[in-house]
Amino acid sequence: MAELDGVWNVKRLGGLLPPLIGVRKVIHGNRGETKLGPVPGASFDVVGRSLRYRAPFTGFVDELEPDGERYLGLATFRGRQFGRFAMERTGD
């Protein structure tokens, strides 16, 4: 989904997510990665507005909804929500 292409800063809004300081999502086409600083991160497939994580994180899915210039996300595991976050595009 081209509208998601780019580098996004991630901010925790609530739930069981840890503080997300330094966390970014890098998306290109139908693939992406959640990264913490320079460390390689968790890979995912983009399916519509869902980010479906690959092994070893199979079962984790981020569901995104547009909110102006940003996206609001629900972090889920096997269909159960455990956290909320926002994604804002970086200047990169």
Residue map of PLM features:
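Tryptophan-anchored aromatic micro-motifs
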Residues: M1-G37, G73-A75
